[in-house]
Every structure is written in structure tokens, then in C-alpha cells.
Amino acid sequence: MPCTTILVGKNASYDGSTLVARNEDSSNGVFEPKRMRVVHPDEQPRVYASVLSHLTVELPDNPMRYTSVPDVIPGHGIWAEAGFNELNVGMSATETLTTNERVRGADPLVDYVPAKGNEGEDGYVPAQTGGLGEEDMVTLVLPYAKSARDGVRILGDLLERYGTYENNGIAFSDVDEIWWLETIGGHHWIAKRVPDDAYVTMPNQLGIDSFDLDDAEGAQVDHMCSADLRSWMAEWHLDLTLGVEGDGPAAVFNPREAFGSHSDSDHVYNTPRAWYMQRCLNPSDVWDGPDADYTPESDDIPWSRVPERKVTIEDIKYVLSSHYQGTEYDCYGSKGTPATRGAYRPIGINRNGQLAVLQLRPYAQPAYRAVQWMAFGSNSFNALVPLYANVETMPEYYADTQTRVTSENFYWANRLIGALADVRFHECGRAVEDYQEKVGGMGHKQIHDVDAAVAALPEAEAPAELARANEAFAQLVRVETDALLGKVLYTTSCAMKNSFAMNDNVR
């Protein structure tokens, strides 16, 4: 999926949490309805069948309960996207990545190839099963992962066995660590631990820019990889490090150069997003003019950086909702020219489907440690709401999305708000910002109050109480969301082209 990701290490976050956040964006012209779901062990398949690749995978018989954000429309797979399991392990999958021709030749993607002809007849060629993809990964890994590292190991084993038909980045988190895995070609992969004091920005482009092969093959303190990565790189001459003696890759090399891309489309679609996110979190750097440290089209924007101050939930929401505010590239702005205002792909885009922020709080007890912040629709116009993840059910307002457009659930209400407010962006802006600030404030208070209420309960009673708290908060969110919908509908209705000032009846 054409998504955007930010990862925040525990010492870089405002409260010591590990934070994993990703927009799930549909393809251009597609708007995929989303909902929330809790998957119980008896609902998890023991034999998984992929819709897109026709792959069948036998799964262990001991899955855990987990949260997910699946597609609503049936027929093309689950696409569970993001969630927590019972052990407070988080997973977000996937961020579609880029690669290059050398990698594609060295380890081709494992595409599904339909059968040719009719079985039993001359010339019949059976279908070729494809590999894993975004459709599958959360369902295949999250119910079984005991830690972030374990999630990397499980997915790595699956990739080496079955391969993949697309280039993807996947995040795993627990209360101590965040790991980022990038697939390389059809069967290879690398994974790197996010530094505790840093954040990571990921547009749809292979991102890791330094990798220690010795660590990955040894202690695995900060790096992991597929078993034959070194020999495979040597055979295909993939490392581009200058001055390396012998045939093998450098012990520390740049994966972005070896496996990634620097295409013209990257400079329109990908690098500007990393540039703007880091501009927000490290504002003292020089971002504009001839002396800029980095420009929107720079190929060397760092994968990870230490922020100038600790990063909050609101910072994450802002950068993942952004459309280059304050620059000549803002599609809603007045700076620059019409050409500059449409030059780069926004992060907050019309086809944002959902945003999941996975927060694991070290100061909270395991029974209520995991909070999954959620937003639906275009991020420029929506608000994040917190949900405790250790629950048996999700509130109907978030879970009962249907294909029918209605204001009765959170997904469609936000889609309607975005479509209406976009038309009169500046006139609706104050109401949208008030809504976002109010709902965000309500969310932080909700967490504080519920934490205190649940702290004294036996651990076994926590899920039911957390579910009640989620439901009560969903009803408050519904009231505020309905009110915003009414405001933007009124504002946009008043500005319709067929309006006329003369009346014949005044109430």
C-alpha cells in the first residue's frame, strides 16, 4: 500500500513508550473501507489461504488473541494491517517499498501465475503459487510473536520459505524495542532495531541506510537478516561501497544504495515526505534555500534521527496528516505557484484509509499497557482516538463499518467530513482543528482516568473493564464527530454555487 510510517524509540517519546505509527493509504481512485476487530484464537485459521497469491500456509495451533484493522469489502483478503496481541507485541504491516533492477534480477519476486490451458489437455501449464504480501502478514505473524524480535524471526522464516510478491517494510514493537524489517527481492530481508533515542521516517522507499552484517550474523544486537545475505550479495555484486577489498560486501554497508532506488518518481512521491517529517521534528536544521541541509528531493535524508525534543502523539498525528504546511508545496496554501503547490505527494492525502498508532507504555501494568490510537479517512480532517487493546470486543462505532455510506460509524463519518471540508478548507479549518484538539484532549484524560480505575482490579477483570471504557469513549467521540459533520455540512452548503441571497421566508 502507498503508506507513510514513523517509528519513535522509547527514549525519544514523551512518556517512554515505544511508538509505531503508519497511514494505510489506498491506491489512487480507490477508497477501501476499514473497521476494527478483535480476532480470538478460535477464529484464527489453522490453514491460511491467501486470496491474491493462492498460497496456503499451515499455522501453529496456539494463536493468541489480537486486534486488527481489516478491510470491509470481502473477496480480496483480510489486510489486518496493525494491532497488538495478548503479550503486548505490536505489528504494523506493510509499507510498500521500492527496489532496483539488480535486486529484481538477483532474487525475482514470487508472483502468482495463473494456469494456462485446461487440466488434462495438451499444453496445460499449472498455476504458479505466489508468495506473501501485505494481505497476509499480520494474520500470519502477530498471533504467534512473543516479542518484537520474535516477530522479525517468524516473518523472516516465512519470507525465506515462501517468498514475497512485493517489496515491503514491516514494524514490530514491544515495550522495550522497535524493529523495522525490509524485504529484499523475493526471499531476502534485513531488519534493524530503531535506536532508543531516535525516530524513523519511512515513505514508500527502501529506507535503512546503514547495516552491520557482522552483528546480523552474530550477536544480533541491532541487526538481523536472511541467512545467506552476505554470500548472495557477493555473488550478485550488490554492495556499492567504495574501497572494499575482495568479492564480499563491506561488513557495514548502505542498503539504500545496494537494494533501493533513487528514481525520478521517488523525488515526487517519496523523498518529500521524509523531508517534511524531519523538518517538523528537527526544525533547527536548514531546510530551505541554496544552503539547505536536505531538500525535498535529496536521496540521503537519514533513516533515523535524534529529535530536538521528545515526540508526542500529537507530533505523530501532525506529520502523518501533513500537506507541506508553511511551504510553497502546500496544496491548500498560498505560497509559491500552482505548479509548486501540486508538485509533491502529500502525507495527509484524500485516500488515507486508517492511521494506527501503537503505544506501549512502560509505566502501565501489562493488563492495560497497550493503547491503539486510531483515525479513519483523510488525516487532515480526522482525529486520533485511543483504544485499550487488551479487550475481547471493539466498540460497534469503530467495528461495524459496512460498504453502505452512513454517518452511523466512525469510518464513514470521517470520510464524509473530509470530502465536505476539503471543498471549503479554510472556512472549515477552525471547526476541524477544534474537533481534533477536543477529541485528543478527551483521549488523554480517558487514558489517565481508566488507568487509575483499572489499576486496583485483578488482572482477569481488566479486559471487561477496558472494553466498557472503550465503548463509553466511543459514544463521546460519536457526539463530537456528528457535531463536526453538521458544522462542515452547513459551511459547505452555504458556499454552494447555486446559492442566492434573496429570501421569501425568514424563520
PLM region spans:
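A contiguous strand-loop segment
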Residues: 2-134, 154-293
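Soluble extracytoplasmic regions of secretory-pathway and membrane proteins
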Residues: 21-34, 96, 181-183, 319-330, ...
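Short Pro/Gly-enriched beta-strand edge/turn motifs at strand-loop
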Residues: 60-66, 152, 334-342
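Short, charged, surface-exposed loops that flank catalytic or proteolytic processing sites
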Residues: 144-150
